[in-house]
Amino acid sequence: MKFSEYEQLRFERRDHGVLLITMDRPDKYNAADEQMHGELARVWAEVSADPETRVAVITGAGRAFSAGGDLDMVRRMAGDHDRVAHMLREMSDLVYNIINC
């Protein structure tokens, strides 16, 4: 895995093939903006293909796991059909990539 390609996710390898993934926006309670949302959607295919990882654990930096979607992102998307459609596809990818991992 190329951990350096991710800006809002941190990675830590632990013993026995455990990969700890930390969502790293503690100032926003790890709410997913466009950047994090995209990273979360694509990371699972890489985790699944990584021969060093047997299990992945996801957590949040700071005091919260995640506040969910960043409301500023939602406001930016309002009225933009193409952005909303892209985000909905990405949301589907995120869920199915986790399931397939």
Task: Give, region by region, the residue ranges found by the protein language model.
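PAS-family sensory domains
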Residues: 100-101
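Conserved CoA-thioester-binding segment of acyl-CoA-metabolizing enzymes
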Residues: 1-61, 82, 96
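Glycine- (often His-adjacent) and acidic-residue-rich active-site loop
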Residues: 3, 60-97
